[in-house]
Amino acid sequence: MKAIHVSEADSVTQGQVLISLDGTVVEAATRATESQLIDLLATEARLVAERDGGNTLTLRHGFSVLHDTPQMSSALDLQTSLFRTRQASWKTQSEILDQRIRQLQAQIEGMQRQTAALEDQHSLLDDEIVRFEALVSQGNASVVRVLALKRERARLVGAIQSLGSDIAATQVRIGETRNELIGLSQQRTEQILSHLTETQKNIDVLSEQFNADLDRQKRLVIRAPRSGRVIGVRAHTVGGVIVASDPLMFIVPEGDRL
């Protein structure tokens, strides 16, 4: 017992404090539970924002007694800072992959333009070969010229085919990069959901403990259940221990016969 506020034969009113119990242990346990719960609630708010793609952290309902405390403000500041850092990191990571895809697409467009130019040259060569073959058959041109044109045409065909292979390989790289981006996004989401599930389970456990601690704190103050006169006081020593089954005192309503 921390303090005894009444003596034998005192008159008391309903709700008046009779005895105060030492709450050192209970209050320490409550503060410890409260601190852990605050950290978990702030963490949950961050994870929900990350899961939903939000920009701000919002605390869940049901813990208003903790919402406006300095400890909660500090915890939210910490989690908001972490949220911004993780958000920026993911944005940078995804933008790097997006930029890689854009660069590869630009390479494909360049190769496609080269291919179109080579195909135009190939078409012109076909026409020129036909014309020179006609001249050769008439004896007006050398066959050497025709052979040179055909070698050039073969070179163009090889270049066009090589570009086609390069385009196909680059398209594969684009697909791989897109899959990498999707995989990283899925991995990030799975990690967020796993951490969120674990955090919410811990909140459920600690919330029960916190409510139990608050209930114990309320019972540190023993009040008069009704108005009357105090008799049979058995609690006399500050620092003494109360046994649950032992009465501390009796209160007899005024006017009742003892």
Task: Annotate each PLM feature.
Residues 3-16, 37, 137, 236-242:
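Acidic, glycine-anchored pre-beta loop/turn
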Residues 3-6, 23, 222-224, 253:
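Conserved strand-loop elements at the edges of beta-sheets that form or border functional pockets
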Residues 9-11, 39-57:
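Short helix C-cap/helix-to-loop transition motifs enriched in small/turn-promoting residues
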Residues 10-31, 242-257:
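Short hydrophobic beta/alpha edge segments that flank linear recognition/processing sites
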Residues 29-42:
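Short, compositionally biased
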Residues 49-81, 88:
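Alpha-helical transmembrane helix bundles of large polytopic membrane transport and channel proteins
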Residues 74-218:
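Long, charged amphipathic alpha-helices with heptad-repeat/coiled-coil character
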Residues 216, 223-258:
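Surface-exposed patches in structured soluble domains
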